[in-house]
Protein backbone atom coordinates (compact mmCIF):
# COMPACT_ATOMS: atom_id res chain seq x y z
CA UNK A 1 0.00 0.00 0.00
CA UNK A 2 2.86 2.38 0.74
CA UNK A 3 4.23 1.85 -2.75
CA UNK A 4 0.82 2.51 -4.30
CA UNK A 5 0.27 5.63 -2.21
CA UNK A 6 3.66 6.96 -3.30
CA UNK A 7 2.80 6.45 -6.97
CA UNK A 8 5.17 3.51 -7.33
CA UNK A 9 4.59 0.21 -9.11
CA UNK A 10 4.47 -3.18 -7.38
CA UNK A 11 6.10 -6.22 -8.98
CA UNK A 12 4.99 -9.27 -6.94
CA UNK A 13 7.25 -12.30 -7.42
CA UNK A 14 6.89 -15.94 -6.44
CA UNK A 15 9.19 -17.43 -3.82
CA UNK A 16 9.58 -20.41 -6.16
CA UNK A 17 11.54 -18.45 -8.78
CA UNK A 18 15.14 -19.49 -9.39
CA UNK A 19 17.60 -16.65 -9.03
CA UNK A 20 19.78 -17.24 -12.10
CA UNK A 21 16.94 -17.14 -14.64
CA UNK A 22 13.38 -16.29 -13.63
CA UNK A 23 14.13 -13.91 -10.76
CA UNK A 24 16.96 -12.09 -12.52
CA UNK A 25 14.91 -11.59 -15.68
CA UNK A 26 11.95 -10.08 -13.85
CA UNK A 27 14.02 -7.66 -11.77
CA UNK A 28 15.97 -6.49 -14.81
CA UNK A 29 12.98 -6.34 -17.16
CA UNK A 30 10.82 -4.34 -14.72
CA UNK A 31 13.60 -1.78 -14.04
CA UNK A 32 13.01 -2.31 -10.33
CA UNK A 33 14.80 0.17 -8.06
CA UNK A 34 14.01 -1.53 -4.76
CA UNK A 35 13.64 -5.15 -3.72
CA UNK A 36 11.67 -6.10 -0.60
CA UNK A 37 12.64 -9.56 0.58
CA UNK A 38 12.44 -11.93 3.55
CA UNK A 39 15.52 -13.36 5.22
CA UNK A 40 14.70 -16.75 3.71
CA UNK A 41 14.78 -15.39 0.15
CA UNK A 42 17.68 -12.95 0.65
CA UNK A 43 20.43 -15.39 -0.47
CA UNK A 44 18.80 -15.53 -3.92
CA UNK A 45 18.94 -11.75 -4.26
CA UNK A 46 22.53 -11.54 -3.05
CA UNK A 47 23.60 -13.96 -5.77
CA UNK A 48 22.23 -11.80 -8.58
CA UNK A 49 22.34 -8.25 -7.24
CA UNK A 50 25.57 -7.46 -9.09
CA UNK A 51 23.65 -8.05 -12.33
CA UNK A 52 20.86 -5.66 -11.31
CA UNK A 53 22.51 -2.22 -11.54
CA UNK A 54 19.20 -0.33 -11.32
CA UNK A 55 18.40 -1.75 -7.88
CA UNK A 56 19.29 0.92 -5.33
CA UNK A 57 18.33 -0.81 -2.08
CA UNK A 58 17.35 -4.23 -0.76
CA UNK A 59 14.81 -3.89 2.04
CA UNK A 60 14.82 -6.89 4.39
CA UNK A 61 11.64 -7.79 6.25
CA UNK A 62 13.36 -9.78 8.99
CA UNK A 63 16.03 -8.46 11.40
CA UNK A 64 19.59 -9.53 10.60
CA UNK A 65 22.78 -9.38 12.65
CA UNK A 66 24.64 -7.73 9.78
CA UNK A 67 23.59 -6.07 6.54
CA UNK A 68 25.53 -5.68 3.34
CA UNK A 69 26.19 -2.22 1.92
CA UNK A 70 23.03 -1.97 -0.18
CA UNK A 71 20.68 -3.57 2.39
CA UNK A 72 18.52 -2.05 5.11
CA UNK A 73 15.86 -3.35 7.54
CA UNK A 74 12.18 -2.59 7.06
CA UNK A 75 12.19 -1.02 10.54
CA UNK A 76 14.48 1.71 9.24
CA UNK A 77 12.11 2.41 6.35
CA UNK A 78 9.21 2.73 8.80
CA UNK A 79 11.20 5.09 11.04
CA UNK A 80 12.17 7.22 8.04
CA UNK A 81 8.53 7.40 6.97
CA UNK A 82 7.34 8.45 10.40
CA UNK A 83 10.00 11.17 10.58
CA UNK A 84 9.09 12.41 7.09
CA UNK A 85 5.37 12.62 7.87
CA UNK A 86 5.95 14.80 10.92
CA UNK A 87 7.06 17.70 8.73
CA UNK A 88 5.79 16.74 5.28
CA UNK A 89 2.28 15.37 5.76
CA UNK A 90 0.86 17.85 3.25
CA UNK A 91 3.51 16.92 0.67
CA UNK A 92 2.68 13.23 1.06
CA UNK A 93 -1.05 13.94 0.78
CA UNK A 94 -0.44 15.88 -2.43
CA UNK A 95 1.63 12.98 -3.74
CA UNK A 96 -1.00 10.30 -3.29
CA UNK A 97 -3.80 12.60 -4.45
CA UNK A 98 -1.85 13.09 -7.69
CA UNK A 99 -2.05 9.38 -8.50
CA UNK A 100 -4.61 8.87 -11.26
CA UNK A 101 -6.78 5.89 -12.25
CA UNK A 102 -4.72 5.28 -15.39
CA UNK A 103 -1.37 5.31 -13.59
CA UNK A 104 0.37 1.95 -13.37
CA UNK A 105 0.05 0.10 -10.08
CA UNK A 106 1.37 -3.38 -10.77
CA UNK A 107 3.38 -5.54 -13.15
CA UNK A 108 2.32 -9.19 -13.04
CA UNK A 109 4.49 -11.64 -14.95
CA UNK A 110 3.32 -14.69 -16.86
CA UNK A 111 4.98 -18.03 -16.14
CA UNK A 112 7.17 -17.88 -19.24
CA UNK A 113 6.97 -21.62 -19.93
CA UNK A 114 7.50 -21.28 -23.70
CA UNK A 115 9.39 -17.97 -23.93
CA UNK A 116 10.46 -15.03 -21.79
CA UNK A 117 7.78 -14.04 -19.26
CA UNK A 118 5.48 -11.21 -20.27
CA UNK A 119 4.89 -8.32 -17.88
CA UNK A 120 1.19 -7.47 -17.60
CA UNK A 121 0.69 -3.80 -16.68
CA UNK A 122 -2.25 -3.12 -14.38
CA UNK A 123 -3.51 0.35 -13.50
CA UNK A 124 -5.08 1.67 -10.33
CA UNK A 125 -8.45 1.52 -12.06
CA UNK A 126 -7.86 -2.16 -12.83
CA UNK A 127 -7.53 -2.71 -9.11
CA UNK A 128 -10.48 -0.60 -7.99
CA UNK A 129 -12.74 -2.11 -10.66
CA UNK A 130 -11.79 -5.63 -9.58
CA UNK A 131 -12.41 -4.74 -5.94
CA UNK A 132 -15.86 -3.38 -6.82
CA UNK A 133 -16.60 -6.56 -8.79
CA UNK A 134 -15.31 -8.71 -5.93
CA UNK A 135 -17.49 -6.87 -3.46
CA UNK A 136 -20.51 -7.71 -5.61
CA UNK A 137 -19.96 -11.48 -5.20
CA UNK A 138 -18.18 -11.75 -1.84
CA UNK A 139 -20.55 -11.00 1.01
CA UNK A 140 -18.77 -10.11 4.23
CA UNK A 141 -18.80 -7.55 7.00
CA UNK A 142 -16.29 -5.45 8.87
CA UNK A 143 -14.18 -7.69 11.07
CA UNK A 144 -14.64 -10.84 8.97
CA UNK A 145 -11.55 -12.94 8.29
CA UNK A 146 -10.40 -14.40 4.98
CA UNK A 147 -7.80 -17.17 4.73
CA UNK A 148 -5.78 -16.99 1.51
CA UNK A 149 -4.27 -20.31 0.45
CA UNK A 150 -3.04 -19.14 -2.95
CA UNK A 151 0.34 -17.78 -4.12
CA UNK A 152 0.44 -14.12 -3.11
CA UNK A 153 2.10 -13.03 -6.36
CA UNK A 154 -1.07 -13.93 -8.29
CA UNK A 155 -3.51 -11.11 -9.07
CA UNK A 156 -6.44 -13.16 -7.82
CA UNK A 157 -4.90 -13.40 -4.35
CA UNK A 158 -4.03 -9.76 -3.85
CA UNK A 159 -7.07 -8.24 -5.59
CA UNK A 160 -9.90 -10.59 -4.60
CA UNK A 161 -8.14 -11.22 -1.31
CA UNK A 162 -6.16 -8.35 0.16
CA UNK A 163 -7.75 -5.31 -1.45
CA UNK A 164 -11.34 -6.56 -1.40
CA UNK A 165 -11.12 -7.41 2.30
CA UNK A 166 -9.50 -4.05 3.03
CA UNK A 167 -12.44 -2.32 1.36
CA UNK A 168 -14.74 -4.09 3.83
CA UNK A 169 -12.53 -3.46 6.85
CA UNK A 170 -11.90 -7.19 7.13
CA UNK A 171 -8.77 -9.13 8.03
CA UNK A 172 -6.55 -11.41 5.97
CA UNK A 173 -4.62 -14.48 7.08
CA UNK A 174 -2.19 -16.55 5.02
CA UNK A 175 -0.90 -20.11 5.25
CA UNK A 176 2.66 -20.46 6.60
CA UNK A 177 5.09 -21.54 3.89
CA UNK A 178 6.71 -24.89 4.60
CA UNK A 179 10.09 -26.12 3.42
CA UNK A 180 8.34 -28.16 0.72
CA UNK A 181 5.07 -27.89 -1.20
CA UNK A 182 3.66 -30.83 0.76
CA UNK A 183 4.60 -29.14 4.04
CA UNK A 184 2.75 -26.01 2.96
CA UNK A 185 -0.35 -28.04 2.07
CA UNK A 186 -0.25 -29.69 5.49
CA UNK A 187 -0.29 -26.23 7.06
CA UNK A 188 -3.68 -25.43 5.49
CA UNK A 189 -5.90 -27.39 7.95
CA UNK A 190 -3.77 -26.08 10.83
CA UNK A 191 -4.34 -22.51 9.64
CA UNK A 192 -8.09 -23.12 9.23
CA UNK A 193 -8.39 -24.33 12.83
CA UNK A 194 -6.30 -21.46 14.15
CA UNK A 195 -7.82 -18.62 12.11
CA UNK A 196 -11.43 -19.89 11.81
CA UNK A 197 -12.04 -17.86 8.62
CA UNK A 198 -15.42 -16.80 7.33
CA UNK A 199 -14.12 -16.90 3.74
CA UNK A 200 -11.37 -18.88 2.01
CA UNK A 201 -9.84 -17.83 -1.28
CA UNK A 202 -9.12 -20.94 -3.32
CA UNK A 203 -9.04 -22.41 -6.84
CA UNK A 204 -11.21 -25.24 -8.24
CA UNK A 205 -8.64 -28.02 -7.71
CA UNK A 206 -8.23 -27.21 -4.02
CA UNK A 207 -11.96 -26.66 -3.58
CA UNK A 208 -12.65 -30.14 -4.99
CA UNK A 209 -10.22 -31.67 -2.50
CA UNK A 210 -11.94 -29.87 0.36
CA UNK A 211 -15.31 -31.11 -0.83
CA UNK A 212 -14.09 -34.72 -1.03
CA UNK A 213 -12.78 -34.50 2.52
CA UNK A 214 -16.10 -33.12 3.76
CA UNK A 215 -18.17 -35.73 1.93
Language model features: what each stretch is:
Residues 1-20, 28-34, 144-145, 163-176, ...:
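A short helix-loop-beta submotif of the ANL/AMP-binding
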Residues 24, 46, 93-96, 189:
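Short hydrophobic/charged patches on amphipathic alpha-helices used for structural packing
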Residues 3, 35, 104, 110-113, ...:
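Conserved S/T- and glycine-rich ATP-binding loop of Class I adenylate-forming
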Residues 105-131:
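Conserved AMP-binding A3 loop
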Residues 38-41, 103, 203-204:
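Helix N-cap/beta->alpha junction signal
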Residues 5-80:
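Structural core segment of the AMP-binding/adenylate-forming
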Residues 60, 75-109, 116, 139-145:
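Conserved pre-ATP/AMP-binding loop-to-beta segment of ANL
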Residues 128-147, 152-215:
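Conserved AMP-binding/adenylation subdomain of ANL enzymes
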Amino acid sequence: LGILYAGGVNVPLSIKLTESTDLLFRIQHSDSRYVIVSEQQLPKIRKIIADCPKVEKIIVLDPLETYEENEMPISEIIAMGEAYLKDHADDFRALYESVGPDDYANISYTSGTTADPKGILLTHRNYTANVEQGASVISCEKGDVMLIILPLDHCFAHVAGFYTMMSYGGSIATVPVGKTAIATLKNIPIAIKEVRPMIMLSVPALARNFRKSIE
